[in-house]
Amino acid sequence: MNPNDRDLVRVRRYFNLDSIAGAGDEISKIKNLLAWVHNTIRHDGSSYNPEEKNAIALYEICKKEDRGVNCRMMAQMLNECYLAMGFKSRYVTCLPKSYINDCHVINVVYSNTLDKWLWVDPTWNAYVMDDKGNLLSISEVRDRLKKGEFVTVNEDANWNHKTPCT
């Protein structure tokens, strides 16, 4: 999607995303936008999905009703922020190995610098790395887990600023 799309321009201006992303390199912008969504909207997996599911509407209903949204809505919001800033981005539904009637939704964002899609999770403010601190894609995480190789998440990964995940 083109970042000059009028809806994405509106998102970029409404949230002042240029300021949030910062003036650093591409990776720092990706991390800054991830942290901002995580810090702005709290996760509440039991909340109902609002009728309007765009980033601005999600933000406004959460502020108005002092509520959170589920992981899918958080990923939707982050996806729109990335797209508005010119990053290629998608949200991805992750299913457990055994069916348990639940899922988790994360994002992948394309890094031109690293020439790959990166795993990012706004619910946990998390990104996944190898033992050298290199950011990983979903397929790299999967391959490393299958081989029993080291993976970790960033030290500040957490759920709603209450539960660290490291």
What are the language-model segments listed below?
Residues 34-36, 43, 74, 106, ...:
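Broad hydrophobic/π-residue packing in well-ordered secondary structure
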Residues 43-106:
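Active-site neighborhood of thiol-dependent amide/isopeptide-bond enzymes
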Residues 26-31, 83-90, 112-117:
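Loop/turn elements at helix/coil->beta-strand transitions in domains of secreted/extracellular proteins
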Residues 99-101, 109-166:
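His-Asp-centered catalytic microenvironments across diverse enzyme cores
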Residues 1-69:
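Secondary-structure boundary elements
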Residues 16, 35-42, 83-87, 111-112, ...:
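Sec-exported extracytoplasmic/periplasmic mature domains
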